[in-house]
From Swiss-Prot:
Domain GATase cobBQ-type residues, every copy: 252-439
UniProt cross-references to PROSITE patterns, sorted A to Z: GATASE_COBBQ
Pathway: Cofactor biosynthesis; adenosylcobalamin biosynthesis
Name of the gene: cobQ
Record InterPro entries: Class_I_gatase-like, CobQ/CobB/MinD/ParA_Nub-bd_dom, CobQ_GATase1, CobQ_N, CobQ_synth, GATase_3, P-loop_NTPase
SUPFAM superfamilies cross-referenced by the UniProt entry: Class I glutamine amidotransferase-like, P-loop containing nucleoside triphosphate hydrolases
Keyword Ribonucleoprotein: no
Disulfides per UniProt: none
Source organism (scientific name): Vibrio vulnificus (strain CMCP6)
Gene Ontology MF terms: ABC-type vitamin B12 transporter activity; catalytic activity
Name of the molecule in the record: Cobyric acid synthase
Length: 483
């Protein structure tokens, strides 16, 4: 007889209602009980992604949830990943591998095929794990997206899994959100909803009780719990760029990051944003790159378009002024490509074939290729006469010819990155390398000679995940969910 697998799907009334965080917390609750648990998200739309053990690509939220489960991330935890590369189009990634580019209408028609991929991955996880915590996408009540849905109730019905609906009370309108979402579901979908969770509550719970009673009476569904607002949680954001936390003590380093239209993997900067002595500022449309010690050009899903956008904002001139005054510039992935002499796209990987003139700050030339590099990397960074171990991951199309000193030596002996002869400009394909304490300390020393004590980024994430799990165990009636 096939062993029963515990499943639960968390759907939300809106985007950013708390689905990712709730699933991560539930995963940690089960992992702490010794349950072999895995996360699953049928379809994700995000520009922040992670590399898996198979050398595939999934949303970063599922990688964090895998960490909460204390397991390695797998492509089957997020079988359909959509990475927007224009206002109407996106790259479609199935089970970790890029398939093609599609517009929204094309993907809508492709969903029936994508569902087969989703169910295949779900079956694989069921064969391997005792429990699967599932995350929906956006809201299940988007009327225009319900046909052939694979992200929310369409999957829940196909896989026959129970559902809870979470809403963010901090935004206001929580009762309308929950009542309205349930009302817009079909009778069979309503039947599989086991209850509601209210997220990010602050205040006296007694003032909420009359509303909870009304909701339960009107819907016939229980409120399984009310989660408090967890200040300073500092988990990686999947989409929205998180603002700078409050600084404490003396600011030793000022960093600015221009927000490109297709910025990707901005989680690279979380370690800077969370440090109490580093002032990290994101600069948006119409703003100038203000005085700083370091300008970082981030990754991009559409490098040539974002290079054009950078120039339209006048940021290229700001960068040159910054360098004249002795500042440092760091480019990561797409930002690294922009720093070179040229970026060519002969195959039309990002749109119309052609070539763009780079910023010319590094002696590199990049050609975008049809194959994507997906790899977790270990090596050594040599900078300022010092050598430290470095870890990170690469997610990019394109190969760069480098005629500069290459400061990173991977464990396989391959050289990576580039450092200008003047020593002010550096680039690398490695995402996540700043998370290493030794690397961050060395980079800060390179920038302006400052010595800071880096925080243990992995430990901070572990503490955040445990805080979520603690709150869930305290405030949710898990017996109603069979957990």
């Amino acid at each position: 007889m096939e062993a029963k697998v515990t499943t639960l799907m968390v759907q939300g009334t809106t985007s950013d209602a708390g689905k990712s965080v709730l699933v991560a917390g539930l995963c940690r609750v089960l992992a702490r009980k010794g349950v072999n648990v895995a996360p699953f998200k049928p379809q994700n739309m995000a520009l922040n992604s992670a590399v898996t053990k198979e050398g595939g690509e999934i949303g970063r939220a599922q990688a964090v949830q895998a960490q909460a489960c204390r397991i390695e991330p797998s492509v089957h935890m997020n079988p359909v990943l959509i990475k927007p590369n224009s206002d109407t189009g996106a790259q479609i990634i199935l089970q970790g591998k890029a398939l093609t580019n599609m517009d929204a209408y094309g993907f809508h028609n492709y969903k029936k095929v994508a569902m087969d991929t989703v169910m295949d991955s779900f079956a694989r996880l069921k064969d391997e794990y005792q429990a699967i915590m599932i995350e929906g996408a956006g809201s299940p009540a988007e009327i225009n997206l319900r046909q052939n849905d694979i992200a929310n109730m369409g999957f829940a019905e196909e896989a026959d899994v129970p559902v809870i609906i979470v809403a963010d009370i901090d935004r206001g309108g929580v009762f309308a959100h929950l009542y309205g979402t349930l009302a817009l579901l079909s009778p069979s979908e309503q039947a599989r909803v086991k209850g509601f969770v209210i997220n990010r509550f602050r205040g006296d719970i007694k003032l909420l009780e009359s509303g909870l009673d009304w909701l339960e009476e009107k819907t016939g569904k229980p409120v399984i719990g009310v989660l408090p607002f967890l200040h300073g949680l500092n988990l990686e954001a999947e989409d929205a760029i998180t603002s700078q936390q409050e600084l404490s003590g003396e600011v030793k380093l000022k960093v600015v990051v221009p927000v490109l239209t297709r910025i990707s993997n901005h989680t690279d900067f979380d370690v800077l944003r969370l440090h109490p002595q580093i002032d990290l500022r994101y600069v948006g449309k119409g703003e100038r790159l203000e005085h700083a010690d370091l300008i970082i050009l981030p990754g991009s899903k559409s490098v040539r378009d974002d290079l054009r956008y950078l120039r339209e904002q006048g940021w290229d001139k700001d960068i040159l002024r910054h360098l004249r005054f002795g500042g440092k510039v760091l480019g990561i992935c797409g930002g690294y490509q922009m720093l070179g002499e040229s970026i060519s796209d002969p195959f039309g990987v990002e749109g119309e074939p052609g070539e763009s003139v780079g910023l010319g700050l590094l002696k590199t030339r990049t050609e975008l290729t049809q194959d994507k590099c997906l790899i977790n990397t270990k090596g050594q960074l040599s900078l300022n006469g010092k050598h430290v171990n470095v870890t990170g991951y690469e997610i990019h199309v394109g190969r760069s010819q480098v005629n500069e000193y290459q400061p990173i030596t991977n464990d396989d002996g391959q050289l990576e990155g580039a450092l200008s002869e003047c020593g002010q400009i550096m680039g690398s394909y490695l995402h996540g390398f700043l998370d290493s304490e030794a690397v961050l300390e060395l980079i800060c020393e390179w920038v302006n000679g400052v010595r800071i004590k880096a925080q243990n980024h992995q430990q901070l994430k572990e503490q955040a995940i445990d805080r979520i799990a603690d709150a869930i165990e305290e405030h949710l009636d898990l017996s109603q969910l069979g957990i």
